[in-house]
Amino acid sequence: VINTAIITTGFLHNEALNIHPEKRLEDLSSEAMAEYFAVNTITPALWLKHLVRVMDKHDATVACLSARVGSISDNKLGGWYGYRASKAALNMTVKTASVEYKRRLKDAMLVSYHPGTVDTELSKPFQKNVAAKKLFTPEYTASQLLKQLSLLDRDQLCHFIDYKGDVVTW
């Protein structure tokens, strides 16, 4: 029996497949969009599908790494169509799954989590625009995630928060 699961799949760019965040509509391709959704939305959805059967019925927490750019209401910059859309779809999947998890498990909480900019291969091409104090180590990121999960109101089915514990709008 598992009481906490953290789903960390995701990608923003893939040099081998020549996939990069789109800056304009003309940059869109069906192949890139399909890859974004396969990795950022479908894979976590399949994890949610299988985890519901093995999670602790009295204390289940599932967090999916999402991104603030997956917030529909917070999108003021545009661009990054595939990544944004796939993360927005992930957030809807988490929100929808939280309803079923609550029905099937006595105490379940699902979370879409924006970790900030983490010093990994995902963010490498974009780090030059990030202030040093806003570029987090994987260790710090993991500790913040666990800390924020422990502080959440378990009576609320689903949360979308960032590394500071602030609510991110859907």
Regions found by a protein language model. Name each.
Residues 1-9, 13-14:
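A glycine-rich helix->loop->beta "capping" turn
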Residues 6, 63, 110-113, 123:
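Hydrophobic structural elements of the Rossmann-like NAD(P)H-binding subdomain
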Residues 11-42, 46, 59-104:
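Catalytic loop of short-chain dehydrogenase/reductase
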Residues 46-54, 97, 107-108, 151:
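A structural motif corresponding to the C-terminal end of an alpha-helix
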Residues 58, 76, 152-156:
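Glycine/proline-rich active-site loop of Rossmann-fold NAD(P)-dependent oxidoreductases
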Residues 86, 117-120:
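Ser/Thr-centric signal marking residues that sit
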Residues 91, 101-118, 156-160:
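Conserved Rossmann-fold SDR core element
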Residues 112, 120, 124-170:
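C-terminal helical subdomain
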